[in-house]
UniProtKB/Swiss-Prot annotation:
SMART domains assigned to the protein according to its UniProt record, in alphabetical order: B41, MyTH4, PH
Positions carrying Phosphoserine: S30
Residues bearing attached sugar chains per UniProt: N474
SUPFAM superfamilies: PH domain-like, Second domain of FERM
Domain FERM: residue ranges: 404-757
Comp. bias intervals (Pro residues): 563-583
Location of the MyTH4 domain: 237-399
Recorded GO CC terms: cytoskeleton
Chain ranges of the PH domain: 95-199
Residue ranges with Acidic residues bias: 29-41
Region entry Disordered, spans: 28-71, 557-584, 598-625, 750-796
Name under which the protein is recorded: Pleckstrin homology domain-containing family H member 3
InterPro entries according to UniProt: Actin_motor_Myosin, Band_41_domain, FERM/acyl-CoA-bd_prot_sf, FERM_2, FERM_central, FERM_domain, MyTH4_dom, MyTH4_dom_sf
Gene designation per UniProt: Plekhh3
Amino acid sequence: MPLPGGLWWLLCCRRGFTLLHRDYGDGELSGDGDEDEDDETFELRTPSPAGGGRGSLDVTLTQPTRNGPISDRLQGWEETWSLIPDKGLPEEDPDIIVKGWLYREPRGGGARPWLLPRRAWFVLTRDSLDQFSSSGKGARRLGSLVLTSLCSVTGPERRPKETGLWSVTVSGRKHSIRLCSPRQAEAERWGVALREVIASKAPLETPTQLLLRDIQESCGDPEAVALIYRRNPILRHTSSALYAPLLPLPYEVSAPGPGYAPLREEAVRLFLALQALEGARRPGPLMQGVLQTCRDLPALQDELFLQLAKQTSGPAGPPGLPATQDPATLRYWQLLTCMSCTFRPGGAVRGHLLGHLERTEQALPDSELAEYARFIRKALGRTRGRELVPSLAEISALSRRQELLCTVHCPGAGACPVSIDSHTTAGEVARELVGRLGLARSRNAFALYEQRGAQERALAGGTLVADVLTRFENLTSEEAGLEDSPDCGWRLCLRLHGPLHPEGLSPEGHELPFLFEQAHALLLRGRPPPPEDTLRALAALRLQSLHRDFSPRGPLPLLDRLLPPPIPPREQPPCPTRRPPPSAALLAGALWSPGLAKRRAERARRGGTGRSTGSTAQVGGGGASTTAAVLGGWKRLRGMGQAEAMAAYLALAAQCPGFGAARYDVLELSTEPGGGAPQKLCLGLGAKAMSLSRPGETEPIHSVSYGHVAACQLIGPHTLALRVGDSQLLLQSPQVEEIMELVNAYLANPSPERPCRSGSSSGPPSQDLPDTSPPSQHQVLEEPQGQSGCLKQLQD
């Protein structure tokens, strides 16, 4: 029976469809022996086994060009067959590692589901992956894939919507092969074997790496270096495209990250972005995008360093004499400056880059290019890892080789401008401001904080301020479209870090007003909420320090600037009894404060008296009785000087329970096997004790003085270990470094009220407990045992 005409036409034109797909399709096929691949001039070479030196290159390595039609390109199977002798299936070859029947999925099988996987006999040796028509003697070889150190293997993974088989993808220089098997164990066996063969291969080198080695060996002979540049255009500036990366990058089919192409394709795109810099009206965002790509794909950092060294060498070789003042020429140097302040180049690339900069300085000592070269050399010596790429303001400053100006807000001193560079740390800025304000001999410790409204977080001493400014810029751009964005954005501020020492403050220095303003800011945010009489006394002292003696002719003060905002009363339903966290059994006993149970029993006996008092204290923000009480206390302070009022304010505020306590959201990890899931808790660090409480609760569940803390150390990226006696508490938080620094600061600062670390004593008194609950949920804490003379004077 004759076949239908349409089927005859399909069979006869199958070869024609393949050629059309090769010429006008995606450029790469993965059929049985019909793979079409791009021709590349850059051959990869294996280093000589003897190692060491090589003779000078006699051949000229040029940038690959595409002059002929696409149909004239070499086919992948022709290239691989030229490397392997044409022979049949080997018999008992000792180099065979794995062999067996597998399915090979045609390229584009997901897009063309009618192309079914083809079954073939695969043999893996130490040099290649071969495909045969059968497993018998004399079987015809259908194709080969040469395995090098740059090949990559992905999988196994199952594709239920396509083939339903387990697949392993092997990516080579020209094409990739997807091996399929119905059994997962077999796919895993092939994947492991392929990875072991690739890992055993010697690393390959590109011609660019060989030329870099020649330049390094001839660095003492300028004429030899110039000759290498003249004979090899790949090292010089070019206006044409780059079709292959300068460094050996792994062959991959899958993208290394969301929004990115494979590494080799991204390297070519980077070079196109560099060339786009020459005509860009706003080069800053384009530079930032290039830096972000290198930040997301670290394998491209050395590649970009080499591309910039190539483009800054000039068409005739280094140092690039033509049009040194041309902005298009300088933009390569500006991007290289940003790169040197963000990333650290590898060994060979770093040596070549330093040599390139040195040759530029020697050839053009008084030019602007030499200034850029000197700036970059200094930056390479100081650069370490960056968390974020430079901000647009930093890129603009680096393009002019200038420092960046940042503003730090200091209580009592206003905004202080500080000049920083890409390597300045938060500790260096804090030390500079401490010295500028005359606080170097103070007993109090200070640190740099990032602040936004009531949110604040201490910066570790080694944090780069440039990264913090970049984060502020990103947050500002994200919140630009929000309608309910806050009035004040993120800012840097200098504040007290650790325990407060109000005694012995000089009335003439900056420390007294500094601490005075910071204490007032903490009280306005409800940290901590003092009793009603203490609040009124503090308000009167602040009025005396700001306006001196009371005058009936003056305007009435605004109490909302003197007292914390009122808390709306609400009924709290009785909460059920919760299961205690692991720390209840772990840190129970004499180490934890026994005063907690006594205070709970006392408050239960009084039956909510403290809560009503707290409402009175907080609601008194604008009442007539509160205003009269504050004004009455202000009148009784007549004759008190400004410095004396500030000192009395600090002394009274320091007696408030939990004054200056820092709070952190943590996860408590169980130290017992099978102890359960981590529990969310709130860690409070006060001047004399630390406490743990549940989120939203005002009463701490545990408290321990610093004298009982034996050690505080990091045991993981976000895990902190606190050793209390013979027990250990594990806490997890993204701010573990800040917590550890603050705890160690308290541990290194003994005081007469705090028990010694080596001694044993009872828990801290009530005012030593840190405050760990949100400001809107505070109850009034008990009045401190001792009151200053100023408070007694106000109550008389």
